[in-house]
Curated annotation (Swiss-Prot):
Stated name of the protein: Elongation factor Ts
GO MF term list: translation elongation factor activity
Organism: Mycoplasmopsis synoviae (strain 53)
Record bears the keyword Protein biosynthesis: yes
Family to which the UniProt record says this protein belongs: Belongs to the EF-Ts family.
Function, in words: Associates with the EF-Tu.GDP complex and induces the exchange of GDP to GTP. It remains bound to the aminoacyl-tRNA.EF-Tu.GTP complex up to the GTP hydrolysis stage on the ribosome.
Amino acid sequence: MSQNKLELIKELRQRTNSALGDVKKALEATDYNIEAAIKWLKENGIVKAAKKSGRLASEGVVSAHGTPTQSLLLEVNSETDFVAQNEKFMTLVKNVTESVFKAGASTLEEALQVKVSDSETVEQALTDATAVIGEKITLRRVLASKAKEGHVLGTYLHANNRVAAVVEVTGSNSEVAKNVAMHLAAMNPEFVLVSDIPEDRMQEIKKAFEAPKDFDKKPAQIQERILSGWLDKQLGEVVLEKQPFVMEDSLTVAKYLANANAKLVSAHRYEVGEGLEKVQSNFAEEVASMTK
């Protein structure tokens, strides 16, 4: 093979991140015209993408974009963590996030129909990416939030792009709201408010109480105080508003907000792959199967 053809193969792989075999087929089918080969990959990729549609995509990233009054969290999945770190994949996620946020789409169905360019919707861009990258790429979910009057939003995206959170609080201090969103991302409590705990779950928590020595001999008022202190500690494990605040653990989240004249209204957290089954594959076996 000539040096020129090798250079074209290398360039096409860099520009499309397609598999080597697909790159060679595309160039051979287009007489080594690189722009035509890119078009060929896209056109033939629709068939490839359809074949991949039944595969499980449980890796990927979460993304977030927000202002004090509007916020968007979304999750884009790939099949492997390797692809999730790919520059082209991350550029796609950035474009999708910005486009969906700007369009104000509030459901997954609406988000998929948002235009990311003059000629392509989010859904079409994901199909193209599936074909070019070689893995199933999907927009799994979106959460669009708008602050109520007199409230403010705080949006946080962790540096690893695997966890994001949005918090709504009363007042106008978005920095305080963002700090609580960061806490939420890090601590992942089971509930936001004590009032969110179902009665059966609360009873389950209370049943775990082990009375200290001579508890029954203490006055009812003391027993109540001991039980209340124990319960607060347990709730601090599972309820956002009761947890010690990560930036100042002498305060609970609720107290931190109260000091800023704010109250917690709602909170949401996204983490990559929540609720999805993950397929464990043996890389060596996978490579061996490709060489047969």
